[in-house]
Amino acid sequence: MFAAVLDTCVLWPSLQRDIILTLAAHRFFKPLWSIEILEELEFHETRKLIDHGIPSQAAELRAQRLVKKMKMHFPKSVVL
């Protein structure tokens, strides 16, 4: 299985992220990312949700939950 670093520009569009992570879950490849990439993803996901009218606290919680689920489902994906 090959590995690929997924930057925020790949992970941030929701539909694109869902498709790519579904492929990873089916072991087509191993996703890799850094803590910085996940932090950037969380920031941009929060901003997007706020821009769509979600209250800031709820937006932050949803973005945090997204990153937490990614870490849970792909625990060996964080690289330095």
Language model region names:
Residues A3-A4, T8-L80:
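Active-site-proximal, substrate-binding regions of enzyme catalytic domains
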